[in-house]
A protein has these predicted regions:
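Di-metal (Zn2+ and/or Mg2+/Mn2+) metal-binding site signature of metallo-dependent hydrolases
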Residues: 54-78
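Histidine-rich, glycine-flanked metal-binding segment
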Residues: 1-2, 10-58, 73
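Divalent-metal coordination cores built from histidine and acidic residues
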Residues: 72-190, 283-285
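Active-site microenvironment of metallo-dependent hydrolases
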Residues: 1-21, 26, 304-327
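Polyanionic/metal-chelating signatures
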Residues: 99-121, 129-132, 155-159, 163-167, ...
C-alpha cells in the first residue's frame, strides 16, 4: 500500500457507529480497512499516526459562493481544510454564466460584495460550458482543488434576457430565458437557482419560474431557490416554492431553509409538516440549513424592491437623491 492511516477514527457515512481502524490507500483509492483488534496491522510505504483524528467521506457543501474563489486559490484551503470535496456553486440566482459582455459587467458589479470584483481573473467565458471548462483548467492549468457543480443563476438569466425592469417577461423574453436554461443544462449545469429577495430575479412571477423549472426537469435537474421571504411571510414563501415545482414536475432543494427570524419562533414544525405533506404526495424535496440564528446578505437587499429597479447605477442615483426616500 502507498499510504496507511494508523489508528484513525472512521466515520463512514452509513449512519453506523464510528470505529478505530487502519486504513490503507493504493493509487489514490482505499485498498484496505483493518479494524482495531482485527488482526495484524496494515503496512505501507508511508504510515501516518492518525490517532485522535477522524476520517470520513468528503463533505458536500450544498450552498457555496466559491464561483471565483476556486479560480483564485489553487489550494482552496478555506473549504478543503474542512473536508469539503464538492461544492455546489451558482447560488442565489446570481453568478457569472450564461452572460453577454454587458450582463457580465453588471453581475460583477452587483455581487462584488459576495465574491470580490474578480480582479486578476480573465473572465474569458460567456456560456456555462465555457465557465466549467475554465474550472477544469483552474489555477494556472492545474484544475481546482475540489469538485464543483454549477446551478444556472435565474437572476443572471433574467438580467441577460429582460434587464432590470420590474415587470413580467414578454413571450419572446421568456423563450430566450428557456433557451438559455436548456443550453446551460446541456453544457453541464445540474439545476437552476434563484435569489427571490435579490434583483432582478425577484421580479419573476410564479408562471415564469414554473416555465423555467419545466425546462430544468426535462434534464433531470433541480431547482434551488432562496425564497421570497424569511420573515413574517416565510411559510407562504416555502409554499410557493413547493407548489410551483410540483406543477413543473421538478425536484426542489430549499436553500438555507430556516425559520429563525423572531416572528417565526416555534414555527419550524409548520415548515416540516408542509414538506412532509408534499413528500407524501410524491414530491422530490430536500433542504440545507444551519444551526444558528444570524444570517448574511448584502446591504442592497435591505432596500425596497422599487429602489433596486434598474440595476446598480440606478440604485446609487436614488441613494444620492433625498427626494427619492420612501415616506
Amino acid at each position: 500500500m502507498d499510504l496507511v492511516l494508523r489508528d484513525v477514527r472512521v466515520v463512514d457515512g452509513t449512519g453506523g457507529a464510528s470505529y478505530r481502524a487502519d486504513v490503507g490507500v493504493t493509487a489514490g483509492r482505499i485498498s484496505g480497512i483493518r479494524r482495531e483488534a482485527g488482526g495484524a496491522r496494515l503496512s505501507g510505504a508511508r504510515v501516518l499516526d492518525a490517532a485522535g483524528l477522524a476520517l470520513a467521506p468528503g463533505f458536500i457543501d450544498m450552498h457555496a459562493h466559491s464561483d471565483l474563489a476556486l479560480l483564485r486559490d489553487p489550494d482552496h484551503s478555506a473549504k478543503a481544510a474542512q473536508g469539503v470535496t464538492l461544492e455546489v456553486i451558482g447560488q442565489d440566482g446570481l453568478s457569472y454564466a450564461p452572460v453577454d459582455d454587458a450582463t457580465l459587467a453588471q453581475v460583477r458589479q452587483a455581487i462584488t460584495g459576495w465574491n470580490g470584483d474578480g480582479s486578476g481573473i480573465d473572465f474569458d467565458w460567456r456560456t456555462v460550458g465555457e465557465y466549467l471548462d475554465r474550472l477544469d483548467h483552474g489555477f494556472d492549468g492545474r484544475g481546482i482543488a475540489v469538485n464543483a457543480a454549477y446551478l444556472i443563476p435565474q437572476g443572471t438569466v433574467r438580467m441577460y434576457a429582460v434587464g432590470w425592469d420590474d415587470r413580467p417577461a414578454t413571450d419572446a423574453e421568456l423563450a430566450h430565458m428557456k433557451r438559455l436554461v436548456a443550453e446551460s443544462m446541456e453544457q453541464g449545469a445540474v439545476g437552476l437557482s434563484s435569489g427571490l429577495t435579490y434583483t432582478p430575479g425577484m421580479y419573476a412571477n410564479d408562471s415564469e419560474l414554473t416555465e423555467l423549472c419545466r425546462v430544468v426537469a426535462g434534464y433531470d435537474g433541480y431547482y434551488c431557490p432562496h425564497h421570497r421571504s424569511y420573515g413574517a411571510g416565510a411559510l407562504q414563501a416555502y409554499e410557493e416554492m413547493v407548489t410551483l415545482t410540483q406543477r413543473a414536475g421538478c425536484a426542489l432543494h430549499l436553500a438555507h431553509a430556516t425559520m429563525n427570524f423572531g416572528v417565526n419562533k416555534g414555527r419550524a414544525p409548520e415548515l416540516l409538516a408542509l414538506l412532509d405533506t408534499a413528500l407524501d404526495a410524491g414530491a422530490d424535496i430536500s433542504l440545507d440549513t444551519y444551526p444558528y440564528t444570524p444570517g448574511c446578505t448584502t446591504l442592497v437587499a435591505m432596500l425596497p424592491s422599487w429602489a433596486s429597479e434598474g440595476g446598480p447605477d440606478a440604485i446609487l442615483e436614488r441613494l444620492r437623491d433625498e427626494s427619492a426616500a420612501e415616506t
